[in-house]
């Protein structure tokens, strides 16, 4: 079964002069997906972005964590393990090269999960290895 996802990425940082100079524009942009609220975003603050807005690295890290969580909950339900709480505080690492280009280098997921008393804890831990 194939899936298709469509979003619009709209640059909103034109201060009137476009990209006439490196500092003449903002790194702000919106994510617009039909039927959903618009998400106002920016670049990472280290690269000139607005620290009050989500940046690509925030979104990538959150998407990785959320996908892992949703698959974990799926496998837990299928395996009869009752999850009562799930929270993750993932951490992403990046670096800026000598030329100023940034890149995302790693992500570490750190989920904290509570299961119903009497659940098979070893089986609950093993679920993580089944998620790709």
Place the predicted regions along the sequence by residue.
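Alpha-helical metal-binding/catalytic segments enriched in His/Glu/Asp
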Residues: 64-68
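Extended beta-strand/beta-hairpin segments
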Residues: 1-62, 73-132
